[in-house]
């Protein structure tokens, strides 16, 4: 097991700055590049991120700074220190509850199917990571230099987890009402609610349309798949042996949705039914 002196020599990194164990209560974060979302003033000046910086980030006073250090820790500063995984586990449930209650209260005339589809959008990695990036959470991720060289602090999956861990930290420190207040404020500030409200489950629309006009169930045929850092998928929609459309995306699911949307247009389905 590494002792503390070795950890100090190795250091750990927040943003692009190396820090060591002596900064266990204040950790260094980088100067914010103009291409990134604006962070707290201390982020832009390159000084320590402190309790006050976290309060600036979430918009309310905090009590226990250690919860937030844990929420932002992708790598432990020293052997045995907590990282965000357990906090993210709790934050995921806190976020799910807050979103479910928000949808229930704000859409009284909508059925369970609509609420479920909208909840799926709210908790999607794409949505949460985009909000995290706009907030500048990548500036707070505590990570070793190797990860930063590879851009892991802006990785959508990591940002999604860090956002959920932050929800967990606020819940543990300040309670469920504070966590709800933070999420609602963040939603109003960073989310494109108009786009979010669009029912974009084109695959479901296509399946309903083919049943309505008594056509065979569409087949979704994978034409091309490439994984790795830049994934790419191509899917054909085939009905009754005939190719109707082709869709592309960064996941098979996205490719199926895009192919379904094109198929609906190709089949002459009215725009109001598609959306």
UniProtKB/Swiss-Prot annotation:
Keyword Transferase: no
Domain DRBM: start-end pairs: 201-269
Pfam families: dsrm, Ribonucleas_3_3
SMART domains xref list: DSRM (SM00358), RIBOc (SM00535)
Keyword Ribosomal protein applies: no
Domain RNase III span(s) in chain numbering: 51-175
UniProt keyword list: Endonuclease, Hydrolase, Nuclease, RNA-binding
Record GO terms (molecular function): double-stranded RNA binding; ribonuclease III activity
GO BP annotation list: regulation of gene expression; rRNA processing
Cited CDD domains: DSRM_RNAse_III_family, RIBOc
InterPro entries according to UniProt: dsRBD_dom (IPR014720), RNase_III (IPR011907), RNase_III_dom (IPR000999), RNase_III_sf (IPR036389)
Similarity section: Belongs to the ribonuclease III family.
PANTHER family in alphabetical order: RIBONUCLEASE 3, RIBONUCLEASE III
Protein name from the UniProt record: Putative protein A464R
Organism expressing this protein natively: Paramecium bursaria Chlorella virus 1 (PBCV-1)
